[in-house]
Structures are given as C-alpha cells and as structure tokens.
C-alpha cells in the first residue's frame, strides 16, 4: 500500500486508546495524526494528559508525546484532520452512540472498539478474517445517517496485519 491514511484516536488517554496508540506506531497503512480525549485532557500534550497513567508494557511512543490532545466533543475540528478515527471513549453508551454518529455525520468514518453500537442493526461488527462481508450493510447506514462518506463499524479487537496481508474492502 502506497498511501498511508491519516487517523485519529478518540479516547486516546484511556487504556484502550493507549493500546491503539501503541499499535498505530509505525503502522504501514496508518499515520496517527490526531489524538482526542475529554475536555480535561484537551490542550495538553499527550504525555501531560496521560502522565503516570500510561499502562502499556512498552514506553509511550516518542512520536506522540508532544502531540496536543484535542477535545473529542469538537467533532468538526477532529474530523477535519483525519481520514477516519478509531474510537475508544469511556462514557455512557447513549453518549458514545451520539458521539460516534456525530463523527459519521461529519463524514468521518468511525472504527469503534466500544460496545454501544454492537446491536445497532445497520452498524456492522467486523472481524475481517471471519465476516468481512458485513461491511455490505454500510450503504443502508449511510442512507439512515444522510452521509456520503461517514459510517460506523464496530470491531472487537485491533491488531497489526500479518506480513504480506493485503488491505481489502
């Protein structure tokens, strides 16, 4: 793959967000350009926002330490900087659904690690090795949301691709 997609992590300071950050470091398909979290973390560098709560077994990547964390509720600002987001927020399910739909309606695709949309009929839960065809429901979701590009897809986990594995859609 020649192009790297610009991606953001929404909920970047929490445990799952930290995991996304470590997995996206030096990823062949994705360039982590944007980190977003709650208003408490907004405006701080990632290193300041996470502080001693860094929970990963590997050190915080140098490439993100000085990145300024954006306010995840400022959807248009975050969405304008990325091709899509990975969502790992920790909030009540109704708030997660509203936030993820706001990003999708801002024409920003959402790959969610949250359970809030797992039973929404037109939101695919995709485990690529098992059910990649579930993305076929996305046009129906786009119609419901009134979007051309934005959508929500839920995944149960995120890992680096095996060497030589091709990205398919």
Each PLM stretch: what is its role?
Residues 1-169:
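N-terminal Rossmann-like NAD(P) cofactor-binding subdomain of oxidoreductases
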């Amino acid at each position: 793959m020649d192009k790297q997609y610009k991606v953001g992590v929404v909920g970047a300071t929490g445990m799952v967000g930290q995991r996304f950050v470590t997995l996206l470091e030096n990823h062949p398909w994705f360039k982590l350009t944007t980190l977003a979290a709650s208003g408490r973390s907004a405006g701080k560098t990632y290193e300041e926002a996470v502080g001693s709560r860094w929970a990963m077994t590997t050190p915080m990547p140098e490439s993100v330490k000085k990145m300024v964390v954006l306010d995840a509720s400022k959807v248009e600002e975050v969405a304008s900087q990325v091709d899509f987001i990975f969502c790992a927020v920790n909030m009540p399910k109704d708030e997660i659904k509203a936030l993820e739909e706001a990003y999708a309606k801002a024409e920003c695709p959402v790959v969610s690690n949250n359970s809030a949309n797992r039973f929404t009929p037109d939101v695919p839960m995709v485990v690529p090795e098992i059910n990649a065809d579930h993305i076929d429901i996305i046009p129906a979701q786009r119609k419901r949301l009134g979007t051309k590009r934005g959508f929500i897809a839920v995944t149960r986990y995120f890992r680096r691709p095996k060497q030589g594995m091709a990205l398919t859609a």
